[in-house]
Amino acid sequence: NNIIKELTDESFELVDRPQCLERICQNIEHFIATSGVDRDKILGVGVSIVGRVNPETGRSYKYFTSWEEPLRDIISSRIGIRVMLENDTRARCFAEYTTGKSQKESNVIYLHMGRGVAIGIVIDGKLYYGKNGFAGEFGHIPFFDNEIICACGKKGCLETEVSGIAVEDKIVQL
């Protein structure tokens, strides 16, 4: 529960290219170098990424999917430190559970409404992944009777009306 340093790279755009992966690794290296912590004492690095993620295999199903190795293993081999990969909303949920206002609770639901819509779930002090590992990805549930095609390819998903992207689109149309 001791935050040593924070780093935000607001100019960063996550895309599925080698240059993007290199930037991620450079940001991690810069963070470690300027943290004031001896590199040998770092047990691991947590990386959260938007979209579907399998933390057990270390794979992202949205970014860097064409690479043979899991994203977690690629980053780990480049920086020389063990890496844990997690979905961004689940990571935020767990951070809220362990260090935020929900510390005294054993069950937490964290709603994230950004460019997409998702929830993170903690049950009995553990992140909940569901049967297929994607619990909380409810932004792509058909919810509206509209003809708006979602990023996932379906029509009428919750994200087509209430996500950050949907709100931006509505403002542009005004």
Where are each of the predicted segments found?
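Glycine/GP-enriched mid-protein hinge/lid loop-to-helix segment characteristic of carbohydrate kinases
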Residues: 6-10, 15-20, 78-89, 95-174
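Glycine-rich phosphate-binding loop and adjoining helix at the ATP-binding site
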Residues: 4-107
